[in-house]
A protein has these predicted regions:
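Membrane-proximal, glycine/serine-rich, low-complexity loop/turn segments characteristic
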Residues: 33-277, 281-348, 352-357, 361-366, ...
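Low-complexity, intrinsically disordered/propeptide-like segments
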Residues: 4, 21-29, 326, 342, ...
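Exposed, low-structure sequence patches enriched in small/polar residues
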Residues: 226, 260-310, 314, 318, ...
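A generic structural signal for short coil/turn motifs at secondary-structure boundaries
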Residues: 25, 164, 196-200, 522-524, ...
Length: 785
């Protein structure tokens, strides 16, 4: 026990020291800077940031970027920057609150922030088996965090709510970001989701605190991320009988929504997750004069205009002062002063007539003002003639890159009671892990990855059309698993070493691409290979352009650690003999803005696919023999995906559609619905020219299939194995009616979700029904101040 306490204390101490060092990396260069004139914040050439590279127009057509606000994300290998759009769009704001996704593309257990899995199988991650994977609605991965650079501090408050204190949902987000100077900025985000649940034993309480900082200097760049998540999900195992939803008239008793019997009670999943990222680089290069960006030219023109107006105002004020002195109209009586030594009756020789004096001084003042105005106009003309708009810029040629990522996770599954004969197996575990008949399955792990790279950057010379990087990476991971009552628990350490390279082209308007390769040379993952490539081509057609996006990868990977080893009271496996799984993916998408059409095609091929299977018996709503285990298919499995997006507008009427077709060669191993459909019909107009309104209804639908079932004890979705109790879901439309508003920087909505409830099979996961008809409201307010 002492050793265990000592280990926990040491881990906390290391985390504090680690966090302090990361903050120091950011603070030292930031404190060395002064507060100079602030422009767009991207005056330094960086081959990884391409402001000319357009985002998908169909995805960003509703986004209006505030002036002076720039956002970007970083990748997990090198910290390369990619422009990002701010989350300020009115369009589909009301759907951002759903765990099922904006377009209903996720299967979920039903509650706010509850476990979910992508129904479009090509979008899943098949290499991970973490306990937080199913909570992707709430957890923001480091590669999706938006860094900010703004002319003024940014504050955003978002809140949505439904129901009451017994069964409602509340979600609060608060974000703040500010720049210290033109190079350095930081921000933080607080996120709290509390879903009490409309069914028994279903509540979720999710907390996230994330802070970040960035420093973009001429030679040194750094990005820092810290995040901590505390996640608690109450597990009910689903309802005992689906007929309470599908055929309530066939049951012997009638239940309200919160009275429907569920399988489990007093069962919880609890996870604490800490993440830290430090991505920094030192650039070596030279200075040269380059054209300013449109934003910089606009800022420079604004500064020149302000200076001219100031000088003109000063000249006018000086001329008016001289004119007033000449005419004697000073606006206030002057106090007469008596000069000592001058006799009272003394006279000035040669006094001029007062009218002549006023005329002469007035003429002189007007001539002076005219000369000053002519001078200002000459400056204006010279500025207008100067169209070069150049600046001196530091151009990096070579970058020395270091990227550090640290994750520490603690996961516990707790059960105070379980149904009789519910589990098929029972294993011997440490006494402090499970007392008597209760369950206290503990698993924790940490992962530390260091990547060192040298990059030759594109853009410093016209004869170098691309950038290139080479890197080495080391990864150390420690997994803590339960053992028998004598050994108690074990720590399993895995070290891996890999090398790789990248070719990248982000500059220009026609062609962009990025190819990354990595090979593992030592450790448990020796022999693993990952090759990822993506690119886009812009082709002009009929005074418009078509954007063709291409993506492909080849992954030969060792199964994740928890797919190979897992120990708990009722689930236990050690699969050292699993083969490497091969995943090949080819994807292409085409977007034509003129017709508002988008097409997507994807092909996936799996060999030795590793997956989780679940099996049990069900008799008169009683479940027995519940078990789950890792399986590997020796088959060659193919998955074909075709998606179509088409939008229409007729006056104030808008109609948006997304259709996805999927076909898998073996639905017993990789089950997918053949058809997914989302449609949105709404009126778009303004009230009093200031209040933008979207009023309409949307619907999500998918064809019935044997969907993966949720296994709460493992926080994973699993393929249904027992043909006698296999359950289909789908073939049911879910319709929402909404009114979505935008008033300046304030977005708000009112909605009646699932207006057609009570009419059928409303499950998005087997045995986990969706909420019935619910009135919802939400608000998001952004302040730049």
């Amino acid at each position: 026990m002492c050793a265990e306490v000592y280990e926990v204390k040491m881990k906390k101490t290391y985390s504090i020291i680690f966090a302090s060092l990361l903050l120091l990396f950011l603070a030292i260069p930031a404190m060395a800077q002064d507060n100079t004139f602030y422009d767009d914040g991207f005056s330094v050439t960086d081959n990884t940031f391409n402001p000319n590279r357009a985002l998908d127009s169909l995805k960003t057509k509703h986004v209006k970027v505030p002036k002076g606000l720039y956002l970007w994300t970083i990748d997990d290998h090198f910290g390369d920057r990619t422009t990002a759009a701010p989350d300020t769009a009115q369009h589909l704001f009301m759907n951002s609150i759903f765990t099922t996704g904006r377009y209903g593309e996720y299967n979920t257990t039903g509650n706010l922030g509850a476990p979910r899995i992508a129904r479009i199988a090509t979008d899943r991650d098949y290499t991970s088996f973490g306990f937080t994977d199913v909570l992707s609605y709430f957890i923001t991965p480091p590669t999706a965090l938006r860094f900010t650079n703004a002319l003024s501090p940014i504050t955003n408050l978002s809140f949505n709510s439904c129901g009451d204190r017994t069964n409602g949902e509340d979600h609060l987000k608060a974000l703040f970001a500010v720049n210290i100077n033109r190079e350095a900025g930081f921000g933080f985000k607080f996120d709290y989701a509390y879903g009490r649940g409309y069914y028994q034993n279903q509540s979720t309480a999710l907390f996230d605190y994330t802070m970040w900082g960035s420093y973009i200097g001429q030679r040194y760049n750094a990005h820092v991320i810290f995040s901590f998540d505390h996640l608690k999900v109450t597990e009910n195992g689903g309802i005992t009988n689906d007929e309470y939803i599908t055929h309530p008239e066939a049951t012997s008793e009638t239940y309200s929504e919160n009275e429907i019997p569920v399988v489990l009670s007093s069962n919880w999943n609890r996870t604490n997750a800490f993440h830290a990222t430090l991505a920094h680089r030192y650039n070596v290069g030279f200075y040269r004069k380059v054209p300013m960006t449109e934003q910089e030219i606009e800022a420079r023109r604004f500064a020149i205009k302000a200076q001219k107006e100031k000088e003109a105002a000063e000249a006018a004020a000086e001329a008016e002062k001289m004119l007033a002195g000449a005419t004697g109209n000073t606006g206030a009586p002057k106090q007469s002063k008596r000069l000592s030594g001058r006799p009272d009756d003394a006279m000035i020789v040669g006094d001029l007539n007062n009218d002549s004096l006023r005329t002469a001084l007035k003429k002189a003042a007007e001539e002076r003002r005219k000369l000053l105005m002519d001078s200002l106009m000459a400056k204006k003309d010279s500025v207008a003639i100067d169209t070069s708009w150049t600046k001196e810029e530091y151009v990096p040629v070579t970058s020395f890159i270091h990227n550090l990522q640290f994750d520490d996770n603690w996961h516990t599954y707790i059960a105070y009671q379980s149904p009789t004969n519910f589990y098929q197996n029972k294993y011997s575990v440490p006494v402090d892990f499970a007392r008597r008949d209760s369950i206290n399955d503990k698993t924790d792990y940490f992962n530390l990855r260091n990547t060192f790279a040298i990059g030759l950057l594109e853009g410093f010379n016209k004869y170098v059309p691309m950038g290139a990087k080479v890197f080495i990476a080391h990864n150390i991971a420690n997994y803590r698993l339960a053992e028998d009552s004598l050994t108690r628990y074990s720590n399993n350490v895995e070290n891996t070493f890999s090398v790789g390279g990248q070719l990248i082209k982000t500059l220009g308007n026609t062609l962009h691409y990025k190819v990354l390769g990595e090979v593992w040379l030592a450790g448990k993952q020796v022999g693993d290979v990952k090759i990822d490539g993506e690119g886009d081509i812009r082709v002009p057609i009929l005074k418009d352009s078509v954007v063709l996006n291409l993506k492909a990868f080849y992954h030969l990977t060792t199964p994740a650690y928890f797919q190979r080893h897992y120990h708990s009271k009722h689930f236990w496996w050690d699969h050292d003999g699993l083969n490497k799984q091969m995943h090949t993916h080819v994807e292409g998408s085409l977007a034509y803005t003129k017709t508002r059409t988008s097409l997507r095609f994807a092909y996936d091929n799996f060999q030795n696919l590793v997956y989780l299977g679940v099996s049990y018996d069900r008799n008169n709503s009683v479940i027995t023999g519940y078990t789950a285990d890792i399986m590997q298919s020796s088959k060659n499995i193919s998955l074909l995906t075709l998606a179509i997006q088409q939008d229409f507008t007729l006056g104030i009427l808008n109609w948006e559609n997304r259709i996805t077709f999927q076909k898998c060669s073996d639905n017993n191993i990789l089950p997918v619905p053949d058809f997914n459909f989302w449609t949105n019909l709404y009126l778009k107009f303004k009230i009093a020219r200031v209040l933008a309104v979207h009023f309409g209804a949307d619907m999500r639908y998918f064809k019935s299939y044997y969907a993966p079932e949720y296994v709460p004890q493992l926080s994973q979705f699993a393929v249904q194995q027992n043909d006698n109790v296999k359950t289909k879901i789908g073939n049911y439309p879910v319709i929402d009616v909404y009114a979505n508003f935008l008033l300046k920087r304030c977005r708000f909505f009112v909605m009646m979700s699932h207006v057609n409830s009570g009419t059928g099979n409303y499950f998005f996961t087997p045995h986990y029904p969706l909420n019935q008809r619910v009135f919802r409201l939400g608000l998001s307010w952004t302040v730049f101040n």
